[in-house]
Amino acid sequence: MIAQIKVLFLLFFISFLSTAQETGSIEGKIISKDGFPLSGVTIKLGKKITSSKTDANGLFHFDNFPIGIHTITIDAEGLKRQSQEIKVVANEITRVSFTLEEEMQTLKEIVIVIKESPNKKKETVLSGLNIKPMDLPQSIQIVSQAVITQQQTIRLSEVVKNVNGVYVGSARGGAQESFWSRGYDMTANNMLKNGFRQNGGSIPEVATLEKVEVLKGSAALLFGNVTPGGILNMVTKTPSFTKGGEINFQAGSYSFYKPTLDFYGPLSKKMAYRFVGTYENSGSFRNNVTRDRVYLNPSFFYKVTPKTDIIIQGDYLKDNWTPDFGTGVIGQIVANVTRATYLGALWSNGQTKQTSLSGLIKHQLNSDWKLSFNSSFQNYDRISIGTERILPLANGDWTRPLGQNKATEQIIGSQINIQGTFTTGKIKHQVFSGIDSENALAQAYTFVFNPANYDIINIFDASKFLTRTDIPTATTTKIVKTTTNRFGVYAQDLLSVTKQFKVLAGIRWSWQEAVADTYNFSPQNSIVKGDAIQNKAFSPKLGLVYQPNPNTSLFSSYSNSFIPNTGVTITNEPLKPSLIDQYEIGIKKDFWKGILSTNLTLYQITNSNLAQTAEFKSDGTINIDTNVKTLNGATTSKGIEIDIQAKPAEGMTIMTGYSYNDMRYTKTTGVTGSFIEGDRLVRTPANTANFSFFYTIPIGKLKGLSLGSMMNYTGERLGGYNNTIGQTIPDRTIPLNGYTTIDVSTGYTWKKWSILCKLSNITNELSYTVHENYSVNPIAPRQILTSLKYKF
C-alpha cells in the first residue's frame, strides 16, 4: 500500500509540473580546460549585477529573469575575464557554457573569502525549502566546518556549545551524550544524519562533518514524530571533482591521539569520490577509563546526466569504551570523591558498532523544479558489561550491582521530495512536498546475574573491603523485539505575497505503528505477542514574515507536533498521542551589509494533554495502576533566545548567544504518583550562554597566525527525578550549580602546513552531568590538545 501511495503521489506532482508556468530562465555550466566542473565560481548577469555561484557540479542558474539581451560576466581572481551575450526568451530556458583556460593545479590554490550574513545563506536540509533563514519564520543555526576545525572539536557536545540553548543533559555510562533544547530531550528521534534519524545510543564522529544544522522548535512537519525542542542534523562531507585532501594528527592530555585522513578527487569526468578515516586511542582524566575508535566514511558522486546526480555514502563506526557511571550521589548530594576516581569493576567494558549506507538521487526537472529520492539503511549494535548504578550509603559503603546491556536496531528509511517555484498572479510560491517512510526493528536484551550483586566497596576508602577481580557471566532471560513502521505525507509552501510580506504554510499527516513481542528464555521458553499500537496525527504549521527592508525580518509562527504515549485509558484502550502547540515570534536583523547578524526569538511550547496516572478507574474506584492514564496534565516551556554573529574584519569571526528557558508542570491530577504542579523539570537549566572568538591574521609578517577563545555557561539545574505526590522519600532531585568553561587556542598556518593548540577549561571548573540519579559524570578538567595538519 505504501509503495502504491508513493507512486500515485509522484505521478500527481509530475502531472502538476506540466501545467506549471515557466518564465525566462538561464542555465549554465563552467568547466576547466581538463573538462572538470568548477564549483564556487561567481557569475554576474545584467546591468544591475545579479550574481550566482556554481554548485559542486559546476552548474548555475538564474530564474524568472527579464526577457531580452543580457551579458554574462565571469570575473574572479586567477581567471581571465570572460563575457558572453545571451538572449532570454519568455517561458524558455537559455543554456550557456564556459571553459576556463587555467589548469586544475592553478585553480585549486585560489581561496575566495566571502563575507555573507548567515541570515542570507540558503539552507536546504532542515528548512525543507531552499530558502534563506531571513525568510524562515523559525530560528535556525549552522555550525560550519570552518568553526569545527578552528575549535579542534572531537565530540559533538563541543560543536553544540556554539548553539545557544542547546546543551548536554546527560552522558549515561560514558556511552552516549544526550542533547536538550527548549526543555526537551533531542536524543531519541531528533538526532539526524543527512536528514535521516540517527540512533542516539552512540557518540558520533565529527571528523567527517561539513556542518551541523540546528532547527529550533518544532520540525514535525518535515520529520513526523519528533519532540518540539528542535532538530539536530549532521551533514557529512561529500565528494569533489577537485583533487586534494589532508592528513591531520591530534594529540593531547591523558594519552589522547587521533590521526585522520581525508582525501578526494575525480575518478572520471562524471564520477568523484571522497574517503574520510580516523582512528582514536585515549585514556581519560578518569582512572582506568579508555577509548579505542575506528571510523570510516567513503562516498561516491556520479553525474548521470547534466540534470541527474547520484550520491552514495557509507559509514562505519567501531567504538570500544569503558562504562563509567561517575561518582555517585548520597541522597541529594554528589559524592565527595576526586574527579579522577573510578568506582566500577576494572574489567568493565563496552562496544558500539554502527554502520549505515545511503543513496541520494537528485534530478533537475527544469529551471524551477527538482525531484529527489533518498534512502538509507542503518545498523546499530551496542553491548556493555560491568558494575553500575552508584548509590552508596552515607558512610560510603556501596554494594556494587552487576549489569549487562545489549541493544540492536536496524532502520530502513526512504524519502521522495519535490520542490520548485511558480507564480499565481503576483504571488511567488516556493513549494516543498513529499512522502517519507521508515521501518525499524529494535531488540532489547535482558540479562540476569546470580547473584545480582558483585561485591562491596567503600567509595572513600578503597582499602576497607577486599575487591573482587573475577568476571562473572550472565544469563539471557528475555529479548523484546519492537517493530516500528512510520509513514508521512507533507506539503509546505512559502508564499511571497509582496516583497515585504511572506507566508509559510504547511501540513503533515503522520502514521506510526509499533508492535513489541517478548521472547522469554527463563524459567521456560515462551513468546508473548504484543498488540499493535497505532498513532496518527496531523501537524500543521503557519508562519508570517514581514521584511520592511532587505536586512530586517520580523516573524511569527504556530506549529503543532505529537508525542506517542504508553499505557491505556480507564476503558483499557491504547492512549492517544499528546498534541503539543508551539508559538514563536522573533526578529532577524543584519547590520553593515551583513558584517553583524542578530536574531531574537521568543517562544512558548504547551503540552496541554500530558499523560498522567488516572485518579479513578472506570467504575469510580481509586486507581493505583500507573499504567492506567488520562491526558489531562500539562507542561509549558517558554523562553527567549538571542544569537549574534559578526565578521568585523577579514579573518575574524565572533559568535555569541544567550538563552532563557522555563519548563514546568502547569497542570497535574494531584493523585498519588502524579507530578507536582509548578515544579521545574529536571535537566532544564534556566540560563545558558556561549561566546567564541577566532582571528587569523591575513597579511603582514604575522600572516597565518591565529588566536581564539571560547566561553560556555550552563546555569543552575536539577538532576535526579522530579518529585511526585505521595513519594516515600522527601526529595528526589539533585541540585547542581551553574558553571562556566573557558577555552583558548593559538595556531599558525604556513603554505600547506598548519598547527593548532588548544587549552580547554583553563580555570579547571568542576561540575557534573547527571542521568536520573545513577550516572553522575564530572566534566573534563583542564586539558591540552594539539593538531598538526598537512594539506595536499
Where does each model-flagged region fall?
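Structural signature of Gram-negative outer-membrane beta-barrels, strongest in the C-terminal barrel
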Residues: 305, 409, 428-430, 436-440, ...
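Face-selective signature of the C-terminal outer-membrane beta-barrel domain
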Residues: 357-380, 401-517
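C-terminal beta-signal and adjacent terminal beta-strands/loops
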Residues: 608, 712-729, 747-792
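Membrane-embedded beta-barrel scaffold of Gram-negative outer-membrane proteins
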Residues: 364-366, 370-376, 382-386, 553-554, ...
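Acidic/polar loop-and-plug regions of large Gram-negative outer-membrane beta-barrel proteins
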Residues: 280, 284, 297-364, 377-409, ...
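Acidic, small-polar-rich N-terminal luminal/periplasmic segments of exported/outer-membrane proteins
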Residues: 36-39, 44-49, 63, 92, ...
